[in-house]
């Protein structure tokens, strides 16, 4: 609706809008002003509404969450779906704005290197996507999951953005020691083979064994060709063998021989993945797709709630247990309930932290 200009006002007055004395008729000016005010108010309302709509649209756009997959493997899509569903549910329960976030799932092969700055959070799944994010997405908040600690993708040399967080598949070594403790009080002597330069694993294992009052026997190797000799020496002195996620020691070439050697000595082996248990290990603490999704979900919620994220490198927050009943029977070991093992581990973990 166009606003009345001064010429139109004059025309209105020339058409009998004056009284006999030539003065404007009483109330005409006030009526005209009221019309102007009403129309100006209408325009202001439209302007405010437009600006508000633009602000809401910008906020919604900035609230987008992008999940980048390294490839088309089923596990990536399973984790991405679990992240989406669990995050929306948690954000809704906590009344966070991420409950209305738009989740996008893409593979890195379909992306342009110049990704727009319209995502509040980016999640990468797998090593390739994490490496892509390091190179191209250093202006975003990034959570990289489904990556092993041994990949050494994290660097503190300043080449990485301070808002790139690494959520490792690896379980803390203490959880594997807790599993051994929960399986049987008879497992007092624990054996483990580690790389000679892996001081972090050595320190962590020694501390955990001390807390749980277990005797730890460590064999260190410099060369993968020495695994057999070190393993045989170790198996004579232990009740149970612990595998650590070191690809120099445990890989497609060595796993079968390690399992056979342990089985011949009637020594159960604790793995670090579900695949290891399916191959012949007695049990393992590992990260399921849902565990990984929950860990990512918790970090996303912290961003939206303004909470501080304390560490850029994070070990798995959640865990699952897999127990191989067939291996247990072949070793004359009693079958254990996974729920029972989890409960025992959690209770003992609480005891050691009290």
Language-model features, listed with the residues they occupy:
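Bacterial N-terminal signal peptides
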Residues: 42-51
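Aromatic (phenylalanine/tyrosine) cluster motif
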Residues: 12, 40-42
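Intrinsically disordered, low-complexity segments enriched in serine/proline and basic residues
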Residues: 2-4, 21, 26-28
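Ser/Thr/Pro/Gly-rich low-complexity, intrinsically disordered segments
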Residues: 7-10, 14-16, 21-22
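N-terminal signal peptide c-region/cleavage motif recognized by signal peptidases
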Residues: 53-55
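Short hydrophobic alpha-helices and adjacent helix-cap/hinge residues
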Residues: 57-354
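Cysteine-centered motifs
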Residues: 33-36
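Positively charged n-region of N-terminal signal peptides that target proteins for export
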Residues: 2, 38-39
């Amino acid at each position: 609706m166009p606003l009345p200009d001064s010429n139109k006002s004059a025309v209105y007055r020339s058409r009998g809008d004056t009284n006999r004395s030539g003065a404007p008729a009483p109330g005409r000016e006030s009526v005209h002003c009221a019309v102007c005010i009403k129309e100006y108010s209408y325009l202001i309302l439209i302007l405010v509404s437009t600006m508000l709509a633009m602000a809401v649209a910008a906020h919604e756009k900035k609230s987008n969450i992008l999940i980048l997959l390294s490839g088309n493997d089923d596990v990536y899509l399973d984790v991405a779906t679990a992240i989406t569903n669990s995050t929306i549910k948690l954000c809704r329960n906590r009344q966070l704005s991420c409950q209305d976030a738009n989740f996008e799932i893409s593979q890195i092969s379909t992306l342009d290197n110049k990704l727009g700055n319209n995502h509040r959070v980016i999640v990468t799944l797998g090593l390739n996507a994490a490496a892509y994010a390091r190179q191209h997405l250093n202006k975003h908040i990034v959570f990289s999951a489904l990556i092993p600690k041994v990949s050494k993708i994290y660097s503190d040399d300043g080449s990485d953005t301070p808002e790139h967080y690494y959520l490792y598949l690896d379980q803390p070594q203490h959880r594997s020691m807790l599993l051994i403790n929960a399986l049987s009080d008879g497992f007092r002597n624990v054996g483990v083979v580690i790389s000679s330069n892996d001081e972090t694993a050595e320190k962590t294992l020694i501390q955990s064994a001390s807390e749980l009052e277990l005797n730890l026997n460590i064999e260190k190797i410099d060369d993968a060709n020495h695994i057999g000799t070190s393993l045989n020496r170790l198996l004579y002195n232990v009740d149970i063998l612990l595998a650590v996620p070191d690809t120099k020691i445990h890989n497609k070439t060595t796993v079968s021989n390690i399992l056979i050697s342990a089985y011949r000595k009637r020594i159960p082996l604790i793995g670090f993945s579900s695949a290891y248990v399916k191959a012949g290990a007695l049990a393992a603490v590992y990260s399921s797709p849902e565990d990984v999704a929950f860990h990512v979900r918790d970090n996303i919620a912290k961003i939206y709630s303004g909470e501080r994220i304390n560490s850029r490198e994070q070990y798995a927050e959640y865990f699952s247990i897999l127990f191989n009943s067939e291996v247990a029977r072949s070793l004359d070991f009693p079958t254990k309930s996974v729920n029972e093992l989890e409960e025992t581990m959690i209770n003992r973990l609480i005891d050691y932290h009290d």
